[in-house]
Amino acid sequence: FKVKNSIVDIAMFNGESKAFEIKTELDTPHRLNGQICDYTRLFQKCYIVIPEEKLYNYINYIGPNVGIILLKYVKRHIELYEYREAVSNANIDPEMVMSCLRTEEYKNIVNTFYGAIPDVNDFQMYDICKQQISNIPASNLQKLFLKEIEKRKNCSKLLNVVPNVVRQICLSMNLNKKTIDILIKKLNEPLI
């Protein structure tokens, strides 16, 4: 899930929005401030997931609102435990919301909150919706954003059978299973 200049390792939308940034033994904390700054503008809760032995390398790079999940290696398997719970973030940046939503999603938010979609041409629609979304109270906007994101279908298993070169097209067009099956069939047919 892309958020401004950062890509969230794991984004969860299940009643609330959570971002998880995973750091391994090989990572350094030098980009973490920027990533967390981006994530807190959109997600209600943000966590970093780090190896237990790296805790003191990272703890000074994050604020007290960011949760910490530690990876502990025990007898050839990994255990996760919550060192610090994330504090819920009541703010949400409307500009960040707009950058993450598809056209139909931001139109749905405007329609749900205001009762109508602006009667403007396609060239003006984004800017007008952005302006209207920026006037929605943060608590309402968080709920509406979450509702729209949760509507997205999780088709990762289905996309595993799609060739890499076509996967992005399927994602951006929000194709359903039937359409993807037809596309795969057509791609496998001889040209002549």
Task: List the model feature ranges, each with a label.
Residues 6, 16, 32-35:
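Generic hydrophobic, aliphatic-rich segments that mediate packing or membrane embedding
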Residues 1-12:
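N-terminal, Lys/Arg-enriched amphipathic/low-complexity engagement segments
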Residues 13-15, 72-76:
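Short acidic-glycine loop/turn motifs at beta-strand connectors
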Residues 26-72:
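Catalytic cores of nucleic-acid endonucleases
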Residues 128-192:
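C-terminal, charge/polar-rich interaction regions
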Residues 10-26:
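Conserved catalytic cores of phosphodiester-cleaving nucleases, focusing on short active-site segments
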Residues 77-152:
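A conserved mid-domain beta-alpha-beta active-site/ligand-binding segment of alpha/beta enzyme cores
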